[in-house]
Structure formats: structure tokens, C-alpha cells
């Protein structure tokens, strides 16, 4: 086949808020430490491992790229449409999110509504996504006041976790695959284009592809990245 034998591990990393960005968070949990240490240790105890790679899409793609930046234990990573460019991804969602949560009286009241509801509306999912980010990057509340004016300090906490910010500090990445759809409905193509350009300026080698598509229905991209990851793990071992 196109791909050499490999062990594929697909852990359930959903949280009570749904999303997971794979960083250490006081509210959501120490998911970065879990990936770097706990999961790798468990796998090494069970199997004969020659190396480790990370691949993910959307939040998982974000996790792959930042863990590749911050950890030194991954032999290859692949980021499919991973969160990047927080201004255009999350910042422009604050007004809509604020409107939704204030229907219920605030963030905590909205979360109570979601947990007790028999079903969720489409707008509930997007609101919950932003609140999951707030719990990951800050104190669980939105980085805006009741008039949707940004709290600069709180928003800076979010931006400190944007790959566009992190790449200025963490530049020793393993072999890295990045791709994104040119019609991504969350504007991620703009952030990842900026990251791609900055990595080129910094001389950081990476595989880059922008494909025809959106943020949805992109599982087929794994047909390209998984064989690439396995090949790079073999080269490193």
C-alpha cells in the first residue's frame, strides 16, 4: 500500500465543554502534559515504539502544531486546518457569542442551559466552542465587556497561544505538514497562510498545501499526511 505499518492511536479527548486545544489549562486540564508524558509512556509500556508523530484536524491540528513547537518528543507532525490567526478566527465571533450568552444572563447561565437542554441549536455549538476557548486560554469568561469592548489583558492571554505568536519563540519544529482549505468557513486559511509565510522567513522547513475545500469533509487529507508522517518517523529512528 501507500503507507508502511504503523500503530494509530485515536484517544477520546473530548471535555465537558466539547473542545480541546491540547494545552495545560487550570479549567480544562493538563492536556499538553498528558500528550507529552502520560500517553507516550502508556504506549511505550504496551508496544515496541520507534518514534512518535502527531496528526490532527481543526483543534487537533492546532494541538499538533503547538505541541510540535513546544515539546521535543515528536518526530513528525501534521496540522490539518488547525486554529491559527485568532483575530480572524475567534475575535470576530465575540459579538455573536456575547449576544447568545446574554440571552441566558451570562456565560455560566448559558452553560447550565446547554447541560440541561435535550438538544442544542446550531448557534449553541458555536457559542460553546468560544466558551471552551475562554476556559482554555483564560478564566472561562469572554475577553469583552457587556458592550463587546475587548479587555486588552484578557485578549492578550488568548493571543499568546496563537501559533502566529508562538512561532516567534518556538522555532525548533520536527518535520511539519500544514494544509488548509482555501474556503475555510472559520477564516483559518488566512492565519495559516501567515504562519506559512513567517516560517519561510525564519527558514523553518515544512510541507505546505492549500487545497480546494472548506473546514468540513477533509478526512481525505489524512491519505496524504499519514504516510508522510510514518516515513518521517522511520527516517528519524
Tell me what each language-model feature is.
Residues 1-237:
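Non-catalytic cap/lid and distal C-terminal segments of serine-dependent acyl enzymes
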